[in-house]
Amino acid sequence: MAKMKKSLLLADIIDQSDVDLILSVELIENQIRETELHRHAFGQLVGSLEGLLSVQTESGWWVVPATHTVWIPPNTLHGAKSHGPFRGWSVYLDPKRSQLLDSSPKTFQTTPLLKELVHRAASWSDDTSQAVKSRLSEVLFDEIVNLPETLFGLLQPGLPSLKKMTDGLLSNLADNRSLEEWARSIGLSSRTLARRFNEQTGLGFSEWRQRARVLSAIEMLADNVPVTNIAFTLGYENVSAFIAMFRRVMGVTPGQYIQRHNKESIS
């Protein structure tokens, strides 16, 4: 494992599946970056130390605040965008190890131990013994397996009719149409739509739309969009209603969230 500085998410990382290793790479970015959709044979864990990262795949959308990580399974088509200055890291896992983790993307809280292990692995010198690397790799992998999951992701449905519906919602999160209205627009009963939506996304329709709004709000806060503008962009009649929703989901107001996020980015 060697220290490297590459483009965000390392689209040009070594792409092979016959090497049994964990490759740790520290990323340092000082500007907004965006990568095109790409895939690689390694599983990838991406962590944010400062700033916010958004990751898009064919199956969904994840945001990664400071002190959080996102898991991207092998051969998953994905792209990423940072919101403001971003500093973070990646750990690449060989396919064999990746099979022991989730087969779909997930977000996790970064533990202090994981952060230190990544920095240690990324700063190894060329003469570090393989035995030392192997021992630390095992500890690093054990820590990854036991990371606490967070809910900073949103799955898209696979059914074309439902995908068209959610694509429409994501392009206009101010759309307040009810489940019944959406059901009529795609020719389903509301009961059938509710059942299929839950089966496809793991969430009820209202919860899915609320999470989409929260994730979008987090991105806009990172881009320094005023709270008033965010509220109206997301379809709320007034700022108070938006703040109440955000506090109910996140446990803090938007202003408190930004303060905490900035503090975590510094630490």
Positions of the model-derived regions?
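Generic protein-terminus/edge-of-domain signal
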Residues: 1-52
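Short beta-strand segments in beta-sandwich/barrel cores
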Residues: 35, 50-56, 69-70, 78
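Short acidic-glycine-tyrosine-enriched beta hairpin
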Residues: 59-74
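Short hydrophobic/aromatic patch on the recognition helix
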Residues: 67, 193, 197, 241-242, ...
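Ligand-binding loop in jelly-roll beta-barrel domains
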Residues: 76-98, 103-105
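Short, Lys/Arg-enriched, Trp-marked, Pro/Gly-tolerant hinge/linker segments that flank
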Residues: 125-186, 199-211
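Terminal helix-turn-helix DNA-binding modules in bacterial transcription factors
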Residues: 180, 199-243, 259-267
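Alpha-helical residues within the helix-turn-helix
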Residues: 184, 195, 199, 232-233, ...
